[in-house]
A protein has these predicted regions:
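Active-site helix of classical SDR
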Residues: 19, 55
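Residue(s) in the substrate-gating loop at a strand-loop-helix junction
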Residues: 39
């Protein structure tokens, strides 16, 4: 239960508190771009991922709502939703280093730098352009849930 509560506090409540604290400063600056870090789990679900998927669906809803609320202001809002990325997430989720590494055997997952490049790209767009939702997956991952992955021998 404590892991579930921590996940919801981090992924939903943490996002709400961050937006509440930071939005006045973004407005005061006269321009801004707010990024939400979502997940493909905010678009689909998978077995054993109910709470995580629910939390990422929550992040997606918060991003969409903020985009509506800021319409007409010079502030862009983008949700970046990565698929399989080789980060510590898998180790935390599985609590086993070998199992975590096994998720990526024979495939090339996203790296944190790939996500950073996507964010940089969105930042560099003309001011009047807003990317609402950016789903980012490696070429080897076809489905949001990882149900279809190309693995090399």
């Amino acid at each position: 239960d404590s892991d579930m509560e921590a996940m919801l506090r981090t992924n939903v409540e943490g996002v709400v508190k961050t937006i509440r604290a930071g939005l006045p400063f973004v407005r005061q600056s006269g321009w801004g771009h707010i990024f939400f870090l979502g997940s493909t789990a905010g678009h689909s679900t998978y077995e054993g991922g109910g709470v995580y998927c629910a939390s990422k669906h929550g992040v997606k809803a918060l991003a969409q709502t903020l985009r509506l609320e800021l319409c007409g202001e010079p502030i862009r809002v983008t949700s970046v939703d990565p698929g399989m990325a080789e980060t510590e997430f898998s180790l935390v989720r599985l609590q086993d280093e070998a199992k975590a590494k096994g998720l990526y055997v024979g495939m090339e997952p996203l790296q944190a730098l790939d996500i950073a490049e996507c964010i940089r790209w969105a930042l560099d767009l003309p001011d009047h352009v807003n990317i609402d939702d950016m789903i980012v997956k490696g070429r080897d991952q076809a489905s949001h849930t990882g149900a279809k992955i190309h693995r090399r021998a």
